[in-house]
Amino acid sequence: MGTLVAKLLLPTLSSLAFLPTVSIAAKRRFHMEAMVYLFTLFFVALHHACNGPGLSVLCFMRHDILEYFSVYGTALSMWVSLMALADFDEPKRSTFVMFGVLTIAVRIYHDRWGYGVYSGPIGTAILIIAAKWLQKMKEKKGLYPDKSVYTQQIGPGLCFGALALMLRFFFEDWDYTYVHSFYHCALAMSFVLLLPKVNKKAGSPGTPAKLDCSTLCCACV
């Protein structure tokens, strides 16, 4: 019985894999991204907890609301991670981020289960990044960004992201509990890898700005 309960609770516990992602994003001064990851963590964990045994007391929101925002938060996390990788200056950065916030909300309201829920934001972000980087390569007449970015960030990050999506859409029928839990872990790892080492647009260099957990929680609530 204990093993069964632990198995049912595993998707909830595995969603805590986003917690290190929140911490790392904040330390790298990606404060907006950290808040999005925390938002995702909250709704994904609560959604799975409400589906678990003996935890219905935690369900202070309707199931369809939890389901919607867990999917929305995940898709939005993908979008802001890729926009952070693109490294746009203002006002382009905030414009593209808000474009994703609005269009993803409408897309998921229309259909939250299709492949397009995640492939749409990812595909659009990749096209935007490719257009910017190709222009930079043309101006620089060389590779942009540095080779290390491709080998240490983009390659591993996209591999973990692809693994997460394959687990989510093609392998959950094998064993939902374990596969979905690995999906959470792979997705969190993808976000960490795709985020640049430091947010160059966060202000003057020096000691990174502090953002404690209470600020993040208040912003999400």
Curated annotation (Swiss-Prot):
Q: Give the membrane topology.
A: Multi-pass membrane protein
Q: Which family does it belong to?
A: Belongs to the TMEM8 family.
What organism is the protein native to? Homo sapiens
PTM note says: Palmitoylated at the C-terminus; palmitoylation promotes localization to the Golgi apparatus.
Q: Name one GO biological process term.
A: myoblast fusion
Q: How does it assemble?
A: Interacts with MYMX.
**Which residues, per the entry, are lipid-modified as S-palmitoyl cysteine?**
217-218
Q: Please tell me where this protein is predominantly located.
A: membrane
Protein's recorded name = Protein myomaker
Offer one Pfam family short name for this entry: DUF3522
For side Extracellular, which residue ranges?
A: 1-3, 56-64, 111-113, 175
Annotated membrane-spanning segments are: 4-24, 35-55, 65-85, 93-110, 114-134, 154-174, 176-196
Kindly indicate where the leader peptide sits in this chain. Answer: none
Q: List the disulfide bonds.
A: none
Q: Which GO terms describe its cellular component?
A: Golgi membrane; plasma membrane
Arranged from A to Z, the UniProt key words for this protein are: Cell membrane, Disease variant, Golgi apparatus, Lipoprotein, Membrane, Myogenesis, Palmitate, Transmembrane, Transmembrane helix
Q: What does this protein do?
A: Myoblast-specific protein that mediates myoblast fusion, an essential step for the formation of multi-nucleated muscle fibers. Actively participates in the membrane fusion reaction by mediating the mixing of cell membrane lipids (hemifusion) upstream of MYMX. Acts independently of MYMX. Involved in skeletal muscle regeneration in response to injury by mediating the fusion of satellite cells, a population of muscle stem cells, with injured myofibers. Also involved in skeletal muscle hypertrophy, probably by mediating the fusion of satellite cells with myofibers.
Provide Cytoplasmic-side residue ranges.
25-34, 86-92, 135-153, 197-221
Provide the disease association from the record.
Carey-Fineman-Ziter syndrome 1: An autosomal recessive multisystem disorder characterized by hypotonia, bilateral congenital facial palsy with impairment of ocular abduction (Moebius sequence), micrognathia, glossoptosis and high-arched or cleft palate (Pierre Robin complex), delayed motor milestones, and failure to thrive.
